[in-house]
């Protein structure tokens, strides 16, 4: 595991770090998005929101005099087969003097703007809080200590101890492997003659047959959550989730076969036996914190010891030889095999199937590509949509949780 990487360079000062939970940074940003997640209308054509309390999201970083701003409506559209399709409005909060309506004074009348202020707010003050760079910071979870919007609106619950994506995480895991020895001798239970990789592959197949399922949306969430919490969904390559494989630095585990097959490669499940749990990584590692311009980097150094008398010792060594700095290589036994005939007898009239009568093929109408549909959206609408999450019809994927570290071999 490796230390977090900066996602971009900026001249802005680094945000003040508080380890008690995520909070909007005290400094401005070069982005143009709201610091907070949106409230979403439950259906189309809903009137502007009304709030039980002040309507200002909780932000402990600001003084009470600075707690004022506006909610702005964003009409959003979703690409569809017949063109763009309207979806219920989203409303985003900005502090006075920031965001798309930065030129307005508090209380100025404008369609799609709802002004709000907390108790003791000085509405003549124009905020220097700025707006969010969505490539560097997650949306901050909405909390209203004095009452939120009316029942026509909702917002997705985000726990305070983490964000949804890996773009803003400053702490990622880095681990090599040397630590208090874990029990890796469970292989003795089934006998040393049982091949480790074959058993790992069987675990995945058995779990998939049991019908454990996740939706397309869930698979996408697994692959794009905070970097240090990601897992590889089915039908994803390793580099789609954790970036390209490298040599001699972070991200150096996995050969080309493992990268292509992802969790279908039995070697993945086998090696997850040696990967520390979250608690083991935290309390059994050498933890090194380091403040960087983009945030706090945490490095975890952990060692797992496989005893030489372990029945699967040779298999673990073999996998490491193949996969450590393995980019650009494949296992020697992973050669494509020619397809063989089901029978060694030559095909004759007596044993050959009769040719089927060929039906004329129907001409298929060309499908409308997504990029053609996307052209129906303006640049402003595409930017608005980028801040929202759409809920597509679930595409069911058969999935087993064996490769997520829950099963020991």
Curated annotation (Swiss-Prot):
Keyword Ribonucleoprotein appears in the UniProt entry: yes
Q: Where are residues bearing Phosphothreonine located in the sequence?
A: 378
Phosphoserine PTM positions: 190, 192, 379
Alphabetical list of CDD domains matching this protein: CoV_N-CTD, CoV_N-NTD
Q: Where is the composition biased (Basic and acidic residues)?
A: 180-192, 247-258, 368-384
Question: What GO MF annotations does this protein's record show?
Answer: RNA binding
Known Pfam families for this protein?
CoV_nucleocap
**What ranges does the record list as Basic residues composition bias?**
358-367
Per the record, the major location class is virion
Compartments, record wording: Virion; Host endoplasmic reticulum-Golgi intermediate compartment; Host Golgi apparatus
Q: Where is this region: Dimerization?
A: 226-333
Q: Which pairs of Cys residues are joined through disulfide bonds in the record?
A: 320-323
Q: Which GO terms describe its cellular component?
A: host cell endoplasmic reticulum-Golgi intermediate compartment; host cell Golgi apparatus; ribonucleoprotein complex; viral nucleocapsid
Posttranslational modification:
ADP-ribosylated. The ADP-ribosylation is retained in the virion during infection.
Start and end residues of each CoV N NTD domain: 31-156
Q: Which InterPro entries match?
A: N_prot_C_CoV, N_prot_N_CoV, NCAP_gCoV, Nucleocap_CoV, Nucleocapsid_C, Nucleocapsid_N
Residue ranges occupied by any CoV N CTD domain in the UniProt entry: 215-331
| Positions of the UniProt region annotated as RNA-binding | 29-160
Compositionally biased intervals (Low complexity): 15-31, 166-179
Which domain of life does the UniProt lineage start with? Answer: Viruses
Summarize the protein's role.
Packages the positive strand viral genome RNA into a helical ribonucleocapsid (RNP) and plays a fundamental role during virion assembly through its interactions with the viral genome and membrane protein M. Plays an important role in enhancing the efficiency of subgenomic viral RNA transcription as well as viral replication.
State the family named in the UniProt similarity comment for this chain: Belongs to the gammacoronavirus nucleocapsid protein family.
On subunit structure and binding partners, the annotation says: Homooligomer. Both monomeric and oligomeric forms interact with RNA. Interacts with protein M. Interacts with NSP3; this interaction serves to tether the genome to the newly translated replicase-transcriptase complex at a very early stage of infection.
Q: What is this protein called?
A: Nucleoprotein
């Amino acid at each position: 595991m490796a230390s977090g990487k900066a996602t971009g360079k900026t001249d802005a000062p680094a945000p003040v770090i508080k380890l008690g939970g995520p909070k909007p940074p005290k400094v401005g940003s070069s982005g143009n998005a709201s610091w907070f997640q949106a409230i979403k209308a439950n259906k189309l054509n809903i009137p502007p929101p009304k709030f039980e309390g002040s309507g200002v999201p909780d932000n402990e970083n600001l003084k009470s005099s600075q707690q004022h701003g506006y909610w702005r409506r964003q009409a959003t559209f979703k690409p569809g087969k017949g063109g763009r399709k309207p979806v219920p409005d989203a409303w985003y909060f900005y502090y006075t003097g920031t965001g798309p309506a930065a030129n307005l004074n508090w209380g100025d009348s404008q369609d799609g703007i709802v002004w709000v202020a907390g108790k003791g707010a000085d509405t003549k003050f124009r905020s220097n809080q700025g707006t969010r760079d969505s490539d560097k910071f997650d949306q901050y979870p909405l909390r209203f200590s004095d009452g939120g919007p009316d029942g026509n609106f909702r917002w997705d619950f985000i726990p305070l101890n983490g964000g949804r994506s890996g773009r803003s995480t400053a702490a990622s895991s880095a681990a090599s492997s040397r630590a208090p020895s874990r029990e890796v001798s469970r292989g003795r239970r089934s006998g040393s003659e049982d091949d480790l990789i074959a058993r790992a592959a069987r675990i995945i197949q058995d779990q998939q047959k049991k019908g454990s399922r996740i939706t397309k949306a869930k698979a996408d969430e697994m692959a794009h959550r905070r970097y240090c919490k990601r897992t590889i969904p089915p039908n994803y390559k390793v580099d789609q989730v954790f970036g390209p494989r490298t040599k001699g630095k972070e991200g150096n585990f996995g050969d080309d076969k493992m990268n292509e097959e992802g969790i279908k490669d039995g070697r993945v499940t086998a090696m997850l036996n040696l990967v520390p749990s979250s608690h083991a990584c935290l309390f059994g590692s050498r933890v090194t914190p380091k403040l960087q311009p983009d945030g706090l980097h945490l490095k975890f150094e952990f060692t797992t010891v496989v005893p030489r008398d372990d029945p699967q010792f040779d298999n673990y060594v073999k996998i490491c030889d193949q996969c450590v700095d393995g980019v650009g290589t494949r296992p020697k036994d992973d050669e494509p095999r020619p397809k063989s005939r089901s029978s060694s007898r030559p095909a004759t009239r007596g044993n050959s199937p009769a040719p089927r009568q060929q039906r004329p093929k129907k001409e298929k109408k060309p499908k409308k590509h997504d990029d053609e549909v996307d052209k129906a959206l303006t640049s402003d609408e595409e930017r608005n949509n980028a801040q929202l999450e759409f809920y597509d019809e679930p595409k069911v994927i058969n999935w087993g949780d064996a490769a997520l570290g829950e099963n020991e071999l």
